[in-house]
């Protein structure tokens, strides 16, 4: 009898950490980086909290955090219902803790992602991703999403490129690039060929045979640049490498009920249309809009690619713990 009572007490205690109390159920807690003072009042996240409270009928509290890891831990232990994370941190939250993406901020064109793709000159003998072996490459920088992680991860995941070195060490990626490709331009900030426009210029000026960028690289970076050629002088390589996600809103479904999640989604979507919403989107969230997403739809192809990068999980753990 005593043993049965002890088991019941232990189970009750463990369940208490997983289920919301009635009091918690009517409160939405948002993990957010905060500061003591705001020179620009429109950047104060309290305006977001007040808006969501008015739209949802729930009390809304800001749970202060200072890093992506702190936000993940807040979700993990039920201190917050939602958190805004960048793509890498969201991937960690999904893969290590099974958190879900429910919303994502929009880019200037209204989408919630951009597509990573390789470009070559139109007269290049490179016709496929398999033809890149031994070719000189132009990257946007070290460990950049579309300029390195997506293309290399995609090709590793699809058996086009083999990992050289320790599969658990991120530095093996550089060795892998050097072993499979020819000379690689991997610039640092401030270098001539750094960033998306730099990688495209690197390929245009013949420093490399291929540039790793986005499907929109020509439209984004050639207007007004005299180093660019005409559009018909370039050719994107197929297939593309997948979608790089915008910042999602993540939730832990083990500690936040589906009923509350539905309320959160509906309230946040009204930011797109309600009076005052545009100012909060711009000032607090730095986005023109917000969209409802699913975890697989938003993070799926990104996960497939970067998950194949040697040592990426340990790298992200260290990066976000800083």
Give residue ranges: language-model regions.
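Secretory targeting signatures
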Residues: 1-25
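An extracytoplasmic/periplasmic, membrane-proximal ligand-sensing/linker region
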Residues: 25-32, 36-47, 256-322
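Bilobed "Venus flytrap"/periplasmic-binding protein-like clamshell domains
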Residues: 25-55, 65, 112-200
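Periplasmic-binding protein-like
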Residues: 29-35, 103-120, 165-187, 221-265, ...
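Solvent-exposed loop/turn segments at secondary-structure junctions
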Residues: 35-37, 89-91, 108-109, 124-126, ...
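Hydrophobic residues within well-ordered alpha-helices
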Residues: 75-76, 132, 203-204
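A ligand-binding cleft/hinge motif common to bilobed small-molecule-binding domains
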Residues: 84-97, 154-157, 196-232
């Amino acid at each position: 009898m005593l043993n049965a009572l002890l088991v019941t007490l232990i189970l009750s205690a463990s369940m208490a950490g997983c289920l919301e109390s009635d009091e918690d159920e009517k409160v939405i807690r948002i993990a957010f980086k905060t500061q003591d003072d705001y020179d620009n009042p429109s950047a104060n996240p309290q305006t977001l909290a007040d808006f969501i409270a008015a739209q949802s009928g729930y009390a809304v509290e800001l749970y202060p955090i200072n890093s992506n890891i702190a936000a993940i831990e807040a979700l993990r232990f039920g201190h917050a219902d939602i958190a805004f994370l960048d793509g890498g941190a969201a991937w960690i939250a999904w893969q290590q803790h099974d958190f879900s993406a429910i919303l994502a901020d929009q880019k200037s064109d209204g989408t919630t992602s951009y597509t990573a793709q390789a470009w070559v000159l139109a007269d290049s003998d490179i016709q496929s991703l398999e033809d890149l072996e031994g070719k000189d490459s132009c990257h946007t920088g070290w460990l950049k999403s579309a300029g390195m992680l997506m293309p290399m991860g995609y090709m590793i995941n699809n058996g086009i490129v083999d990992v050289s070195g320790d599969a658990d060490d991120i530095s093996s990626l550089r060795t892998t690039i050097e072993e499979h490709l020819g000379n690689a331009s991997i610039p640092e900030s401030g270098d001539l060929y750094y960033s998306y426009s730099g990688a495209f210029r690197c390929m245009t000026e013949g420093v490399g045979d291929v540039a790793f960028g986005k499907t929109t690289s020509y439209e984004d970076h050639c207007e007004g640049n005299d180093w660019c050629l005409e559009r018909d002088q370039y050719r994107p390589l197929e297939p593309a490498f997948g979608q790089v996600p915008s910042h999602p809103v993540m939730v832990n479904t083990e500690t936040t009920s589906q009923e509350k999640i539905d309320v959160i989604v509906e309230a946040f979507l009204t930011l797109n249309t309600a009076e005052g919403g545009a100012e909060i989107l711009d000032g607090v969230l730095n986005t023109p809009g917000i969209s409802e997403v699913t975890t697989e739809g938003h993070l799926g192809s990104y996960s497939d690619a970067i998950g194949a990068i040697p040592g990426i999980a340990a790298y992200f753990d260290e990066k976000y713990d800083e």
